[in-house]
Amino acid sequence: MVRQLILISSLLAAVAVRAPADPAHPMVTEAPDVNLVEKRATTCTFSGSEGASKASKSKTSCSTIYLSDVAVPSGTTLDLSDLNDGTHVIFQGETTFGYEEWEGPLVRVSGTDITVEGESDAVLNGDGSRWWDGEGGNGGKTKPKFFYAHDLTSSTIKSIYIENSPVQVFSIDGSTDLTMTDITVDNTDGDTDDLAANTDGFDIGESTYITITGAEIYNQDDCVAINSGENIYFSASVCSGGHGLSIGSVGGRDDNTVKNVTFYDVNVLKSQQAIRIKTIYGDTGSVSEVTYHEIAFSDATDYGIVIEQNYDDTSKTPTTGVPITDFVLENIVGTCEDDDCTEVYIACGDGSCSDWTWTGVSVTGGSVSDDCLNVPSGISCDL
């Protein structure tokens, strides 16, 4: 601001030199509008109960936005959509959210070349226990989704710590070339009495070139669920307490293609299953070029590895509308909690699962299924 005031003063001086005032008619010069100058500031800090509304209104006037101990009012989104190219958003302290039954999101970010990060002490606290009722998104209280990373291009989200989300956490949709690093979601409080549900870590749809590394997800649903998209990479992460690493469910959406996905170097702990591909009975789409590599898991409760082409109605014969091809498992080692866990279960439609390659796959401690259907050549449910 000081530099801008100096510039204004210099311009006024130049005008005075070029056009000397008539002593009989002295020139009157208006003072600069201080409020206007403030709006041009490149670094903006917003805090407290008015921080969210002020940030949403002033976001395009700032190249760097600090959100310091912001208290977002109930039923309100911390709206950082349509940011100017290159905007840098930094969370400081504790961001909190008022209570209301609504769908959310609590936070929304979109734009090009955007960086969103949290300082070392920053936490986005959803205080989800106010909504948790064991129903998740399937009934009971209407619960707000947490963080929409929609329509982001060539952007980065890093060092974000989210605590106790009411329901799903990150929704990644319509984004391209997005990198997410060192994301922590801690919903362990929701394990009490199984009150938290549908607290997916990352739901990905209609997005390309998404890279997620260094995540730690403690939740009660999919750690990652890729419903559609291409060129997606998830690595060097820990998933605990949820439903593991999932493709799908695929089908029933505008975009039902999943292609070129890699999960690498992930530990899956105490989850329903470690590896899952689920496609919708009777729908169409495709799943291809999916690789799980160097995955370690322990104490799976329901399945070690499960592939279902009748996900929404397992009583029906799997259908062929969403073929699963070029599916690679390499160096997968894990354990089931007990015999109630099925080590491997495959339910494919007739001829709709092909070109699978599994090497170095070991699942122990559970039961072996004798109900697998249309298992591809070279693959077995009895490892």
Curated annotation (Swiss-Prot):
Disulfide bonds: 44-62, 223-239, 348-353, 372-381
Propeptide: 17-40
Signal peptide: 1-16
Catalytic activity: (1,4-alpha-D-galacturonosyl)n+m + H2O = (1,4-alpha-D-galacturonosyl)n + (1,4-alpha-D-galacturonosyl)m
Example of a GO biological process term: cell wall organization
SMART domains for this protein: PbH1
Recorded GO CC terms: extracellular region
A Gene Ontology molecular function term of the record: polygalacturonase activity
Annotated Pfam families: Glyco_hydro_28
Glycosylation sites per record: 260
Catalytic residues (positions): 221 (proton donor), 243
Keywords: Cell wall biogenesis/degradation, Cleavage on pair of basic residues, Disulfide bond, Glycoprotein, Glycosidase, Hydrolase, Repeat, Secreted, Signal, Zymogen
Assigned EC number: 3.2.1.15
Location relative to the cell: Secreted
PbH1 repeats: 175-206, 207-228, 253-279, 287-309
Function per UniProt: Involved in maceration and soft-rotting of plant tissue. Hydrolyzes the 1,4-alpha glycosidic bonds of de-esterified pectate in the smooth region of the plant cell wall.
Family per record: Belongs to the glycosyl hydrolase 28 family.
Full protein name: Probable endopolygalacturonase C
Organism phylogeny: Eukaryota, Fungi, Dikarya, Ascomycota, Pezizomycotina
